[in-house]
């Protein structure tokens, strides 16, 4: 139902909306937790010549490595639990990210210090997929997981798409 009123010579429409009752079991909601870690890496394909690596990866192929201040967004989508009102306990999710991602990668050289990237080029794309693979087993199958990783304020990757 709408009500029309006049104010200052202009016609204003005031809308009154009747709200429907929400059933928590039918609501799919996304919850997002942000995290941060700093890490060094080198983009390099050992099957290629040094010249080809420099051509393809540019400054990111620096033999002495380089670093990024990564910003991570972990999005969990699922039904709202009617007992708690949560999709997921954000404290639990924060702790999971800290233990499984930040502690593993923060202030480490991804090429040298991590098992995940010994044989995998640590591009932003690969880091994003690896983080998804690390976190996915910890969540119920009924919840969807989406990762967004910022390598710089203007460059980010997402998985899955």
Language-model regions: role of each:
Residues 1-11:
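Extreme N-terminal basic, low-complexity initiation segments
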Residues 25-161:
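Charge-rich, low-complexity N-terminal segments
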């Amino acid at each position: 139902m709408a009500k029309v009123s006049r104010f200052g010579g202009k016609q204003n429409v005031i809308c009154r909306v009747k709200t429907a009752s929400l059933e928590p079991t039918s609501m799919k909601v996304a919850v997002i937790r942000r995290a941060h870690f700093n890490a060094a890496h080198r983009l390099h394909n050992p099957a290629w010549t040094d010249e080809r690596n420099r051509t393809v990866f540019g400054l990111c192929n620096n033999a002495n490595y380089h670093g990024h201040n990564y910003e991570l967004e972990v999005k969990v989508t699922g039904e709202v639990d009617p007992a708690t009102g949560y999709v997921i306990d954000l404290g639990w999710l924060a702790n999971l990210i800290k233990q499984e991602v930040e502690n593993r990668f923060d202030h480490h050289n991804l090429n040298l210090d991590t098992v995940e990237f010994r044989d995998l080029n640590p591009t932003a794309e690969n880091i994003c997929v690896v983080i998804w693979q690390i976190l996915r087993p910890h969540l119920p199958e009924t919840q969807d997981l989406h990762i967004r990783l910022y390598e710089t304020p203007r460059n980010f990757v997402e998985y899955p798409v």
